[in-house]
């Protein structure tokens, strides 16, 4: 599809196609690993949750959705106004950079009950394949904004979800009794202007026999 894509009736050049593919690889590598680490960190804050998902592999799906709500890898996105706009009594000129906090929106108490609580089985969150609209086909449930919204929705969201879930299952299968290494605990931190991730999350496991 990329090779045949057109912009204003013209095909993309080889340079544009190469640059776009490079962006996909970089974007996926920079965010998916953080999402996986954040998910594992969240689960290990309540060890019974980690043991539950390892015993019931289908539960990884809900755990990933809740991670993308509670501690998404990307917490802020920048946009630029295309025209003057007034927002809550403040005039914003055209061409102004506006920072949108995905992380804050995902913690809106009017949308999610007890939003600071990590609960993979919460009844107010749409789990499973994300929707570009951010809505949910299920009454009473809302989608998280961890992958963005609308035309800015993450193009690689399905790959990211698959990598996180399949990768976690494989890691558990191949590393017996996988658990956090002894030592002081860390938590996901804001890095730069956009990312939320662990600085380190060492794990240990028993030798395979």
Briefly describe each language-model feature range.
Residues 1-209:
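Cytochrome P450
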């Amino acid at each position: 599809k990329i090779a045949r894509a057109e912009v204003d009736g013209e095909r993309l050049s080889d340079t544009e196609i190469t640059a776009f593919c490079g962006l996909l690889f970089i974007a996926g590598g920079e965010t998916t690993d953080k999402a996986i680490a954040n998910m594992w960190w969240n689960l290990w804050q309540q060890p019974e949750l980690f043991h539950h998902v390892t015993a019931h592999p289908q539960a990884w799906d809900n755990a990933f959705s809740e991670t993308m709500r509670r501690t998404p890898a990307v917490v802020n996105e920048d946009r630029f106004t295309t025209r003057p706009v007034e927002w809550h009594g403040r005039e914003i000129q055209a061409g102004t950079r506006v920072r949108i906090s995905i992380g804050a929106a995902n913690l809106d108490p009017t949308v999610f009950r007890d939003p600071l609580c990590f609960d993979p089985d919460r009844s107010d969150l749409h789990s499973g394949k994300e929707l570009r609209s951010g809505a949910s086909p299920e009454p009473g449930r809302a989608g998280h904004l961890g992958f963005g919204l609308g035309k800015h929705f993450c193009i690689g969201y399905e790959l990211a979800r698959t990598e996180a879930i399949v990768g976690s299952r494989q890691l558990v299968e191949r590393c017996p009794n996988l658990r956090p290494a002894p030592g002081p605990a860390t938590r996901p931190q804001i890095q730069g202007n956009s990312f939320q991730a662990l600085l380190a999350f060492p794990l240990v496991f028993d030798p395979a026999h």
